[in-house]
Amino acid sequence: MPLLKAKQALNRMDVGQILEVIATDQGSVRDFQVFAVQSGNELLGQTDDGSTYSHWIKKA
């Protein structure tokens, strides 16, 4: 679900804006890496605090 919500949010954003996504699913780490490559958006970073996974994506 976080990936779908991120796609929807990015569609409403202007180029250069940064989206922060916080997820609880460990699989989101790989999902957002693949999404960034496929979509052409830039994955600025990811963090893992053990229970949540944060992702920063820059709209291309």
Residue ranges of each PLM-predicted region?
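Amphipathic alpha-helical interaction surfaces in cytosolic regulatory modules
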Residues: M1-N11, D25-N41
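C-terminal structural segments of small proteins and small subunits
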Residues: D31-A60
